[in-house]
UniProtKB/Swiss-Prot annotation:
It is an enzyme of class 6 (ligase). One of its GO terms (biological process) is asparaginyl-tRNA aminoacylation. It comes from Mesomycoplasma hyopneumoniae (strain 7448) (Mycoplasma hyopneumoniae). The lineage of its organism: Bacteria, Bacillati, Mycoplasmatota, Mycoplasmoidales, Metamycoplasmataceae. The keyword Phosphoprotein does not apply. This is Asparagine--tRNA ligase. Its EC number is 6.1.1.22. Its main location: cytoplasm. GO terms for cellular component: cytoplasm.
Length: 449
């Protein structure tokens, strides 16, 4: 019966002076002719397990191929060592090499290797200490998000990946077809959002959410953009703008705090490697009231510092750039901030039109270091208003008739938002490039493997 490093590290006292059997990969090796110290990781924990090989028990001639990256199976006696920094070590009785290196130069020779270098080998980078921490937190965050929605009474809804509708209207889509170019007999793309379909399911289930890959053919080669990424998109019938903002803030604060509590080792490592105040900053947000301002007020505040921006052309109706969003969160409020009531020409066609005729009931939640993290709105439920807006934008009404029809039958209105999973992970880890928080990144001009 094999044990995992995670099982042993949680309750090392239960395994003290007992025989254990472990499978894993060598992450560090050092020693001399009489004793060898091997650090092992099996993927179950961020922590490594130190294994001690003594010549009196192990034939060193049979393990001369031991090296970084080699897969091994060991058995031996575990000793709990609370007086040391490590949780314990194993005095190895048997060691069997299960996966050798064909080349002694395993790509991850240095555990402190930079993220820039690791990007060139996405199939190996999870075996570095830094990327292991990021991926462990990614998995934990994934789980906490699903748990949050389950506890809030949401239904998980699987929106289609293939669609004939561009829900964002930006035209940045990947076209899908077979070699004969006639598979669907109409233009079909990879989905840019699951929102439109989620709206349909909210009318019946009330509270639904999607959590799935999203595809956008954006040619923006920035540290925040990817062609394939994951989106969390809840949709709630009967909800107003204020209620959906409250849900968005609650989601962030709950899942961030839970991830911090349950993943102490990863955060300690990340703080040593980068932001020393990472947890302090995140917990401050979790325990604070989030400031909410109008788009108009945001423009006024930014105009007071106009000379500090590369993009100085600020006016009512301009699209806020990342530098503006970050300035608001980092220099003015020093915290995440919610901006509401954007000009309708900056937002998608489906958003509720306010009485002023100029703005829509939309919101963006901005965070330090990134800018926009969440974008959402109250949806336009008035059939004629929605139709007029679609005509104004010269949209194909026939393609979206099903969406219009949702307004005809028992529609009380709904609200929802989209949260970029990778951007949230960037915020939580302090990692500055989206390519470093996703296993196999797909970006403009780049698709390794």
């Amino acid at each position: 019966m094999f044990q995992t490093i995670n099982e042993i590290s949680i309750h090392p006292e239960l395994y003290n002076q007992k025989k254990v059997l472990i499978q894993g990969w060598i992450t560090n090796i050092r020693g001399n002719l009489k004793i060898i110290f091997v650090e092992l990781n099996d993927g179950s924990s961020f922590k490594n397990l130190q294994c001690v090989l003594k010549k009196e028990f192990i034939d060193f001639d049979k393990i001369e191929n031991l090296a970084l990256g080699v897969a091994v199976e060991i058995s031996g006696i575990f000793s709990n060592t609370p007086e040391r920094q490590q949780f314990g070590e194993v005095l190895v009785e048997t060691l069997e090499i299960k996966g050798n290196n064909y080349n002694t130069n395993f790509p991850i020779q240095n555990q402190e290797i930079s993220l820039e270098v690791l990007r060139q080998m996405p199939h190996f980078r999870h075996r570095s200490r830094l990327f292991r921490a990021i991926m462990k937190l990614r998995s934990a965050l994934f789980f906490e998000i699903h748990k949050f929605f389950r506890r809030q009474g949401f239904i998980n809804f699987s929106a289609p990946i293939l669609t004939s509708n561009d829900g964002e209207g930006a035209g940045e889509v990947f076209i899908v077809d077979d070699e004969n170019k006639d598979f669907f007999n109409k233009k079909t793309t990879l989905g840019v959002t699951g929102q439109l379909h989620a709206e349909a399911y909210a009318l019946g289930f009330k509270k639904v959410y999607t959590f799935a890959p999203t595809f956008r053919a954006e040619r923006s080669n920035t540290r925040r953009h990817a062609a394939e990424f994951w989106m969390i998109e809840p949709e709630v019938a009967f909800f107003t703008l204020e209620q959906i903002i409250e849900l968005a803030v609650k989601l962030l604060q709950k899942v961030i705090k839970s991830v911090i509590i349950r993943n102490k080792d990863e955060f300690i490592f990340l703080e040593k490697a980068g932001d020393k105040n990472l947890r302090k900053r995140l917990l401050q947000f979790c325990d604070s009231q989030v400031t909410q301002i109008s788009y108009e007020k945001a423009i006024e505040l930014l105009l007071e510092h106009q000379e500090k921006f590369e993009e100085k052309d600020l006016f009512f109706g301009c699209d806020l750039k990342t530098e503006h969003e970050r300035f608001l969160t980092e220099e003015i409020f020093h915290m995440p901030v919610v901006i509401i009531n954007y000009p309708k020409n900056l937002k998608a066609f489906y958003m509720h039109q306010n009485e002023d005729g100029q703005t829509v009931a939309a919101f963006d939640l901005l965070v330090p270091g990134i800018g926009e993290l969440i974008g959402g709105s109250q949806r336009e439920v008035r059939y004629e208003k929605l139709l007029a807006r679609m005509n104004e934008l010269n949209m194909n009404i026939e393609e979206f008739q099903w969406y219009l029809d949702l307004r005809k039958y028992g529609n009380p209105g709904s609200s929802g938002f989209g949260l970029g999973f990778e951007r949230l992970l960037m915020y939580i880890t302090g990692i500055e490039n989206i390519r470093d928080v996703i296993p196999f990144p797909r970006t403009n001009k780049n698709i390794l493997m």
